[in-house]
Amino acid sequence: MTFRNCVAVDLGASSGRVMLARYERECRSLTLREIHRFNNGLHSQNGYVTWDVDSLESAIRLGLNKVCEEGIRIDSIGIDTWGVDFVLLDQQGQRVGLPVAYRDSRTNGLMAQAQQQLGKRDIYQRSGIQFLPFNTLYQLRALTEQQPELIPHIAHALLMPDYFSYRLTGKMNWEYTNATTTQLVNINSDDWDESLLAWSGANKAWFGRPTHPGNVIGHWICPQGNEIPVVAVASHDTASAVIASPLNGSRAAYLSSGTWSLMGFESQTPFTNDTALAANITNEGGAEGRYRVLKNIMGLWLLQRVLQEQQINDLPALISATQALPACRFIINPNDDRFINPETMCSEIQAACRETAQPIPESDAELARCIFDSLALLYADVLHELAQLRGEDFSQLYIVGGGCQNTLLNQLCADACGIRVIAGPVEASTLGNIGIQLMTLDELNNVDDFRQVVSTTANLTTFTPNPDSEIAHYVARIHSTRQTKELCA
């Protein structure tokens, strides 16, 4: 038997993990084992919301060392993280300033300023990326306006996964899928857009040309002295998750469900027309030249904050209590900027309901019900937008990532969208990370080949839409009201 041992470092906004994958060539089987899991979260430092990158690096090294201590020969390592955030380095490779997190308020007002000065359509035609107030484009503008004293010291700007790869290898890389999340990459050239960079205040010399997934960045020398290749995987965690989504046919959509929910479909060409701009659709880079045509949805961040504020440790019990409540009594827009990082999420949700003359969710279960119903309804709206954009309805939706374990939300999604939902795999980002490593090692041919492996090894659960559910009736009433308004307009 021929085995490959690949390590995936998968960092999310709330947790990180070092996972060992064992691939058996002859039977094309893939197994995952968790080596080390650790917390991640926001910190307050010198008036900024930041990431503790030193702690994350220590956790990564601890996980890698654990694998080596077991005497396992590692064939390759790959790192994926969330998008848009970056670390600044000087000429000696030392950090400049703080690793500020995207939920910091320093970018307030800058997106509107960019649209006014550069033109919303021009920015979109150049980048193909949706407008989010924390995109790297606006973060860099905030940095250069608010901390000009740092600029003379900056030699390099590395996005998060590239920074951690650099810390392991001493080699710098700017991986393409994550680079596209910055809103600074030109969608036609796949290189940094000089006009957008100029507006941001950043120097183009801070960046190298983006590289596509599948190249070896450098090598990590393990404690035993072996040189282990560090591969540039699809380093945006959503890009990795999409690679591991067992999409079947052209009418399949995906939903990567975690702190963020990212709903979309794969395409060989981007969508940058006026319809896409009006819907704020993004065209992020994927593996093999594919585009991830999708929309960001605030996701389970709202629930994570409620769990933290209310000190709730038993999520299954909360979901059970939530399931017993009637649907659609409290509806909010999860994508409202007010929910990006409020002082207290519970109060913000209650205020949003109060301002729209709805009942106020008071109990933990009512707050969770509000979040789940609101997310499912937003999923339905976004899926409809995506279908209109491409001119064809979807026949099935694949939900991947940690959020796919929430069976209540999966069923609500199926009912609200009126579509069959297939949930799994849970560790999609990790698997997609491993998939690119196996392709780089010449064990697999391409993404479609890898998806066949995922389909046969992952635990997948199907949720059939129930047209008689409360949320399905609610959606039907909304559609009827919309059609009446359109006819009367």
UniProtKB/Swiss-Prot annotation:
Its cofactor is Mg(2+). InterPro entries: ATPase_NBD (IPR043129), FGGY_C (IPR018485), FGGY_N (IPR018484), Rhamnulokinase (IPR013449). One of its GO terms (cellular component) is cytosol. The keyword Phosphoprotein does not apply. ATP binds at A13, S14, S15, G16, R17, T259, Q304, G402. CDD domains: ASKHA_NBD_FGGY_RhaB-like (cd07771). One of its GO terms (biological process) is rhamnose catabolic process. The active site is at D237 (proton acceptor). Keywords: ATP-binding, Disulfide bond, Kinase, Magnesium, Nucleotide-binding, Rhamnose metabolism, Transferase. Substrate binds at G83, H236, D237, T238, N296. Disulfide bonds join C68-C222, C353-C370, C413-C417. It catalyses: L-rhamnulose + ATP = L-rhamnulose 1-phosphate + ADP + H(+). Pathway: Carbohydrate degradation; L-rhamnose degradation; glycerone phosphate from L-rhamnose: step 2/3. PANTHER family: L-RHAMNULOKINASE, SUGAR KINASE. Involved in the catabolism of L-rhamnose (6-deoxy-L-mannose). Catalyzes the transfer of the gamma-phosphate group from ATP to the 1-hydroxyl group of L-rhamnulose to yield L-rhamnulose 1-phosphate. This is Rhamnulokinase. It comes from Escherichia coli O9:H4 (strain HS).
